[in-house]
Amino acid sequence: MITAIHNPAIYNGIKVFTAGGRDADEIQTKDIEDYISDIKPEEVKEVTYDEGKASGYIEEIYPLNEYLDNIIASVDMQAIRNAGLKVAVDPMYGVSETSIKTILLTARCEVSTIHERHDTLFGGKLPAPSASTLHALQNFVVEKGYDIGIATDGDADRIGVIDDKGN
């Protein structure tokens, strides 16, 4: 995955996950770095996208539906439906807008979003859901009468939650 995690876009880089979906640890990361540093530029082969697909180097995958199904299966969706929640979402210009909105709409929540436009520069702001970055969501929740506000960082692995009073 290419991400700056919850940092400004200038920190974008490659994030490596293990087969189990966890972050690569220091030893695994060092092994990867050592392997890459041993590659000589003249050894790097170039292929077109079509050649890469045909040769099996590139595999197109579409994991979103399976990801959403797993989340929906692990959450008490009926309890959320019964609550009749009005939810404000702030994906902070990152990648969570489609997934979080789909989950909440499946739970029959009323959903509105701010900062939903995908922007690799995160609107020039720090894409981290923390007290210093949630003012817009806090104001939106209180002014529009939402029950809850949910913010995610740029790559959607951190969350911030605002109650109906803006806390």
Tell where the protein language model's regions lie, with residue ranges.
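Gly/Ser/Thr-enriched, mixed-charge loops and adjacent short helices
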Residues: 12-144
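Glycine-rich phosphate-binding loop
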Residues: 1-11, 140-164
